[in-house]
């Protein structure tokens, strides 16, 4: 499971860099865990070069030394044997079970779906394996004759799976009579902070978009003993904010320079992120924290981004090899749709009962101020598995 978490986290960074190329100056929010899980469901039915490309993009090659070398990255070809592929899917099975454990103190609603044109029927074994490893069921639908109704049905299902928070995932032109197969992945998250902000301390403050312009935000404030890490190059400060029971943590990285986010995003690597956010790098401070309230709800049509990362054959009718899921030739992936929703506020989401008092050992710690009044990146991490569930960039209220 550790190597799978490494793969997901590496994918998070590579994917975020691709999004940053086209979404300059825009907010970003996606779930690398959600996207990886959905694509792994398709990977289960791929063979040949299609499988090789998907494994490479999803970082299923677990050799971290190879990953860390820019020279080797271009040359890397991932051909995994059946035992390795089996380990990957068994890893997802365990990871899904851990992250969706009913005893967790957070809510994570996920909609993962594979919809294939019914004239390309799925193998029974593929259907059984998807249910075993991912708890999902591929759907055979009639895109040829009823594509718009299928789109509406998919949207209704996603909306119900996410407690109404994610309606209309597929836009009007998302599918048509020529659609062969689409993937959908939508996630809604809510959690309570370990230390909640006081609503009375929230005030309107300027959020500096760059050195010359700003927008008003509702800025939350608290003074608490929190774990902090410092980054020397590029200069930035990181902070760990735990959710209830420390099942999850929000890791925020704030560049020192108002316009330093672009440099940080380009420079950050998997190894650096692992080092920065390790327990060894964390120091306890009394932190005067100022963090904007915000809600992020981002939708992505992933076809272009994934193809540009090297996963092109899956979307090409003449090259795609999905013979592991269907006997019919010319089956290919028409598109992948992803949407995530998160709200950051004083409570995390809803106020918790009986949280009025806090007992702590009175140890004098150095005091620092962290004022997130300019663009920053953040991660929501599942601590037990060290998996990045969500990646976000907040740069425009």
UniProtKB/Swiss-Prot annotation:
Alphabetical list of SMART domains matching this protein: SERPIN
Gene Ontology cellular component list: cytoplasm; extracellular space; nucleus
Subcellular localization: Nucleus; Cytoplasm
Pfam families per UniProt: Serpin (PF00079)
GO molecular function, a single term: serine-type endopeptidase inhibitor activity
Main localisation: nucleus
UniProt cross-references to InterPro entries, sorted A to Z: Serpin_CS, Serpin_dom, Serpin_fam, Serpin_sf, Serpin_sf_1, Serpin_sf_2
Site feature location: Reactive bond: 362-363
Motif segment (Nuclear localization signal): 74-77
Gene3D superfamilies: Alpha-1-antitrypsin, domain 1, Antithrombin, subunit I, domain 2
Superkingdom per UniProt: Eukaryota
Keywords: Cytoplasm, Nucleus, Protease inhibitor, Serine protease inhibitor
Protein family (similarity comment): Belongs to the serpin family. Ov-serpin subfamily.
Protein function: Protease inhibitor that may play a role in the regulation of protease activities during hematopoiesis and apoptosis induced by TNF. May regulate protease activities in the cytoplasm and in the nucleus.
Record-given protein name: Serpin B10
Organism for this UniProt entry: Sorex araneus
């Amino acid at each position: 499971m550790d190597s799978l978490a490494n793969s997901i986290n590496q994918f998070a960074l590579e994917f975020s860099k691709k999004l940053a190329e086209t979404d300059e100056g825009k907010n970003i929010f996606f779930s690398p865990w959600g996207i990886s899980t959905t694509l792994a469901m398709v990977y289960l039915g791929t063979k040949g070069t299609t499988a090789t490309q998907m494994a490479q993009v999803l970082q299923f090659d677990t050799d971290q030394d190879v990953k860390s070398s820019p020279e080797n990255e271009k040359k890397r070809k991932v051909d995994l044997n059946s035992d390795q592929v089996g380990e990957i899917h068994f890893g997802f099975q365990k990871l899904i079970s851990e992250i969706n454990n009913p005893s967790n103190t957070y809510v994570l609603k996920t909609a993962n779906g594979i919809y294939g044109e019914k004239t390309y029927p799925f193998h029974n074994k593929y259907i059984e394996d998807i249910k075993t490893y991912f708890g999902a069921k591929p759907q055979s639908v009639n895109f040829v004759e009823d594509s718009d109704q299928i789109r509406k049905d998919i949207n209704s299902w996603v909306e119900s799976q996410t407690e109404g928070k994610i309606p209309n995932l597929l836009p009007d032109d998302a599918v048509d009579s020529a659609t062969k197969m689409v993937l959908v992945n939508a996630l809604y998250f809510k959690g309570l902070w370990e230390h909640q902000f006081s609503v009375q301390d929230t005030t309107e403050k300027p959020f500096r978009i760059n050195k010359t312009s700003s927008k008003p935000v509702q800025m939350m404030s608290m003074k608490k003993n929190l774990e902090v890490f410092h980054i020397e190059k590029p200069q930035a400060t990181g902070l760990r904010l735990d959710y209830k029971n420390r099942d999850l943590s929000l890791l925020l990285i704030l560049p020192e320079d108002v316009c330093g986010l672009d440099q940080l995003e380009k420079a950050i690597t998997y190894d650096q992120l692992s080092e920065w956010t390790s327990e060894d790098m964390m120091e306890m401070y009394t932190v005067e924290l100022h963090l904007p309230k915000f809600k992020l709800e981002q939708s992505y049509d992933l076809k272009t981004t994934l193809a540009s990362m090297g996963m092109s054959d899956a979307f090409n009718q003449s090259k795609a090899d999905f013979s592991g899921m269907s006997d019919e030739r010319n089956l290919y992936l028409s598109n992948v749709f992803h949407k995530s929703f998160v709200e950051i506020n004083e409570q995390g989401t809803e106020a918790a009962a009986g949280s009025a008092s806090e007992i702590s050992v009175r140890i004098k710690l150095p005091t620092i101020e962290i004022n997130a009044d300019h663009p920053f990146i953040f991660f929501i991490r599942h601590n037990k598995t060290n998996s990045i569930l969500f990646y976000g960039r907040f740069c425009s209220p």
